[in-house]
Amino acid sequence: MTDHLERDVSDVAHKWVPDARLGVCDVAVRPGALAGCTTSRDALAALRRIAAAAGLAADVRLLPDSSVGDEHSAAVTAAVAPLVREPRVSADHVSEALHGEILAVLERRDDAWLRVRAADGYHAWIHSGYVALGTAAWADDWAGRATLRSLGAELRCEGARFRLALGARAAPLPSGQVETADGRWWDIAAGAVRPEAELRVEARLVAAPEWALRWFSGAPYLWGGRTAWGVDCSGLVQATYAARGVALPRDSDLQSTTGQEVPLSATGGGYEAGDVLCFTDGHRISHVALWSGAGRIVHSALSRGGVTSDDLLADTPTAKRLRDFLVAVRRVERSRQ
């Protein structure tokens, strides 16, 4: 009986929440009940039908749930905040949230951990120490005012220092200072901030891989990273296109389904600068890179220690392996030609 119910619950999850990164269906068979939570109303209805047919209680919560109260939103107050797979410090680091970004709060656990949804749709956990909580109206107010984006800005206030990662958000003040998400006012001591619209124009003046190298060259590889302090392959691609006003999913396999398909070419014929090259590990898309032209790619690779430019057509074991595992090329931005 239990095995049958577990299969039914698994089938519901696969149907209504096929990707656990983009939704939640965390339900288990307990003595006398189905228990857990989900973000899908359709999954909730199906689980209730399964429980009723089996004579079980349906203790399944729809997220966001009552643990959130009125605080449905979180603004990141740390310079960068890790998003993790489970609500514990040692859990896998799956992504990051930058200062000033707004997260949707889905569940609160033990007053320490929050299950959240990021703007790119990613679902994960974050420790409450990294954020400030508030209502949806509070978050909308901050988002409307936080029109500045960091270009490696270093802020100072009465001896305190605060570094903002590339792309982090701040609000302009009439005094020329900036306000951060925790309400503090700062002077800009180094680096710069730009209005988002201005940054978008500046980013589009150069090809995407050139912009990526300008701001990320030499950044160390970090699984789940999104900043020049540490970035993975899909984080680099996502950040590069975010600066251009193009929203991409977080992970490489998700990025491989966006945009327009470009026919594969052994020499790169037909590729344009900024096309996203997608590589497999033999099972799934596991790496992405930006085509730079003349056979070169820009990517963040563990084998290279971080962000660099490589010759994809070179006669080296690494380049040959990449060519052998190239399975798709996607154009995520309208061609300039």
Model-derived features: where do they sit?
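Short, well-ordered loop/turn sites that connect or cap secondary structure elements
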Residues: 91, 97, 164, 270-271
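Structural motif
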Residues: 101, 168, 274-275
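Short glycine/threonine-rich beta-strand-turn micro-motifs
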Residues: 22-47, 113
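Active-site nucleophilic cysteine motif
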Residues: 213, 225-244, 248-249
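Short alpha-helix capping/helix-loop boundary micro-motifs
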Residues: 86-92, 152-160, 257-267
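...with weaker cross-activation on analogous glycine-rich loops/strands in unrelated enzymes
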Residues: 247-306, 312
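Boundary regions of SH3-family modules and the immediately adjacent low-complexity/disordered segments
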Residues: 25, 45-70, 88, 110, ...
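Aromatic- and glycine-rich peptidoglycan recognition patches
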Residues: 133, 195-199, 264-267, 292-337
